């Protein structure tokens, strides 16, 4: 039998290997306990090192976000099924803040506020992840708005133009066409998408907050039928979701859009609507016992929206020149735009389009109130051709509304007043536009030219829309060089204007009004004299007293 020998060197080597591989580090894990839970909120004790906005893991893989950091407990918003969370259950820290997957694979998909697909089309291969609470671009990282974002809606592109990187508020009562305006804007980006040019393409994100499931489905169907889903992502937080999801949904959509913006691409994001996000945040704050302020909203509700909308920007060329344009929607009550949330968002954004229920009920759609609507920075992005033809449009419509109210009580009017009323009625009719039928900017320029230069004065009001559509078809079929020139040069040259006037007059000769009469060709049609308008506005403000 062989003798077993152990050398001292072997023993020494084994000990050295063990010592070198030994680690005295221990993992320290904080575990909290649920004190109470309900209505999507849980209070947890025993997590002294937790960070604000940190993700917490509840039993069953349910996640929560730490919002309130009190001395002895943590108030968390539950993201998921909170019904199964009970008192006494253990809660673990994750050491992470909330983030969502992002990338081009999200185009054409419907996701929830956690970035998980809910359209039944399988998993999404994300390129990377992006934190929801991301700092907005600083002043030196931005540049001024200079490129137009065409909505395809005549009233907006002519009077309240939107530029890439702008925040334009869409505000109005319920059922006034706010969502329709935004969906039309998304549909209008299709031509730019088909060019394949990254400098022209616009990727769209539609964030549905607190909407009915049927409403979200109808928007998705409209986008699919218009061929717009291939460049659109829908982030859905329907009314049936917990308040936490409605609060997070806009930040999720913003994170998805910012990924493209920082890669030098252009993004359009629609928040439909931020009133419901504010309501959800109010519910969360009250359940967390935060002190209420005006209309029971918490003190930081302004910051809730400002830090979201400030992420929309036109980045500097050093950062790629990408942009994210925001169209937040706010719902008013009884056309009151002086309420708390509307005034907050108006002060944050770069302009607003106010949709009025009275105009909507009169059949003026889109029901844009010209007097209250404004675009503070979009004018710099408007193409020169539109500036030239639509320069007097806002003034003409405002004076028409003023004179219309006065004319209702006046028995007789002079010729200048009647001419202004007739012109205004035709302009109102001209700016009406059916839903889901956006117009290219060159078609809009020709249409607005018809109204502001007096070429519709001899057309009966009830035939204005038919005259416009048939003329545009005629120009497209027989004189497409007019459209091509406007599209390529962004201007309406003198030669093109002269040709357009002759085309309009020729078209009038063959146009039959609905009553069978022919339209008078006015060779010298022109805009109303500004001096006459000024005199009329003075007369309106100071009408002569009637004789007894």
From Swiss-Prot:
EC numbers on record: 7.1.2.2
CDD domains from the UniProt entry: ATP-synt_F1_alpha_C, ATP-synt_F1_alpha_N, F1-ATPase_alpha_CD
Top class in the EC scheme: translocase
MF term (GO), any: proton-transporting ATP synthase activity, rotational mechanism
Catalytic activities: ATP + H2O + 4 H(+)(in) = ADP + phosphate + 5 H(+)(out)
Domain of life: Bacteria
A family per Pfam: ATP-synt_ab
GO cellular component: plasma membrane; proton-transporting ATP synthase complex
Residues marked Required for activity (site): 373
Residues the entry annotates as binding ATP: 172-179
Entry keyword set: ATP synthesis, ATP-binding, Cell membrane, CF(1), Hydrogen ion transport, Ion transport, Membrane, Nucleotide-binding, Translocase, Transport
Membrane-spanning parts: none
Membrane-topology descriptor: Peripheral membrane protein
Annotated localization: Cell membrane
Assembly: F-type ATPases have 2 components, CF(1) - the catalytic core - and CF(0) - the membrane proton channel. CF(1) has five subunits: alpha(3), beta(3), gamma(1), delta(1), epsilon(1). CF(0) has three main subunits: a(1), b(2) and c(9-12). The alpha and beta chains form an alternating ring which encloses part of the gamma chain. CF(1) is attached to CF(0) by a central stalk formed by the gamma and epsilon chains, while a peripheral stalk is formed by the delta and b chains.
Function recorded in the entry: Produces ATP from ADP in the presence of a proton gradient across the membrane. The alpha chain is a regulatory subunit.
Family label: Belongs to the ATPase alpha/beta chains family.
Name of the protein this chain belongs to: ATP synthase subunit alpha
Organism: Mycolicibacterium smegmatis (strain ATCC 700084 / mc(2)155) (Mycobacterium smegmatis)
Gene: atpA
């Amino acid at each position: 039998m062989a003798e077993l020998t152990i050398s001292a060197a072997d023993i020494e080597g084994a000990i050295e290997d063990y010592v070198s591989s030994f680690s005295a580090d221990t993992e320290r894990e904080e575990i909290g306990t649920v004190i109470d839970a309900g209505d999507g909120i849980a209070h947890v004790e025993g997590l002294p090192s937790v960070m604000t906005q940190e993700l917490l893991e509840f039993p069953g893989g349910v996640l929560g976000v730490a919002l309130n950091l009190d001395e002895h407990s943590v108030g968390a918003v539950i993201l998921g099924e909170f019904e199964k969370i009970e008192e006494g259950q253990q809660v673990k820290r994750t050491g992470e803040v909330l983030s969502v997957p992002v990338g081009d694979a999200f185009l054409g998909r419907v996701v929830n506020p956690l970035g998980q697909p809910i359209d039944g089309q399988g998993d999404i291969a994300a390129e990377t992840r992006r934190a929801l609470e991301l700092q907005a671009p600083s002043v030196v990282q931005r540049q001024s708005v200079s490129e137009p974002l065409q909505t395809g809606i005549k009233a907006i592109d002519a009077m309240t133009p939107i530029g890439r990187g702008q925040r334009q508020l869409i505000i109005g009562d319920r059922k006034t066409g706010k969502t329709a305006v935004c969906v039309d804007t998304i549909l209008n980006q299709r031509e730019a998408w088909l060019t394949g040019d990254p400098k022209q393409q616009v990727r769209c994100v539609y964030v549905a907050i607190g909407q009915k499931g049927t409403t979200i489905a109808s928007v998705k169907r409209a986008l699919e039928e218009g061929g717009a889903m291939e460049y659109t992502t829908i982030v859905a937080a329907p009314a049936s979701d917990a308040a936490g999801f409605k609060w997070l949904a806009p930040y999720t959509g913003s994170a998805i859009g910012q990924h493209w913006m920082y890669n030098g691409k252009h993004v359009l994001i629609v928040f439909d609507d931020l009133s419901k996000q504010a309501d959800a945040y109010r519910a969360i704050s009250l359940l967390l016992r935060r002190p209420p302020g005006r209309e029971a909203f918490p003190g930081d509700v302004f910051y809730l929206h400002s830090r979201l909308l400030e992420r929309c920007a036109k980045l500097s060329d050093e950062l790629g020149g990408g942009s994210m344009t925001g169209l937040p929607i706010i719902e008013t009550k009884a056309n009151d735009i002086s309420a708390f949330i509307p005034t907050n968002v108006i002060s944050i954004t770069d302009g607003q389009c106010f949709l009025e229920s009275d105009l909507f009920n009169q059949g003026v759609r889109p029901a844009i109130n010209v007097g209250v609507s404004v675009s503070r920075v979009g004018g710099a992005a408007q193409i020169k051709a539109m500036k030239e033809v639509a320069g007097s449009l806002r003034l003409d419509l405002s004076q028409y509304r003023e004179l219309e109210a006065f004319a209702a009580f006046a028995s007789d009017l002079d010729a200048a007043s009647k001419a202004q009323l007739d012109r205004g009625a035709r302009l109102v009719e001209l700016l009406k536009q059916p839903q889901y039928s956006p117009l290219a900017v060159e078609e809009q320029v020709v249409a607005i030219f018809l109204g502001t230069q007096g070429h519709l004065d001899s057309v009966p009001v009830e035939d204005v829309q038919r005259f416009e559509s048939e003329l545009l078809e005629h120009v497209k079929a027989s004189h497409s060089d007019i459209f091509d020139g406007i599209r390529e040069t962004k201007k309406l040259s003198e030669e093109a204007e002269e040709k357009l006037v002759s085309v309009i007059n020729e078209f009038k000769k063959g146009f039959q009004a609905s009553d069978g009469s022919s339209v008078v060709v006015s060779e010298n049609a022109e805009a109303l004299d500004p001096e006459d308008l000024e005199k009329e506005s003075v007369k309106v403000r100071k009408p002569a007293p009637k004789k007894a």
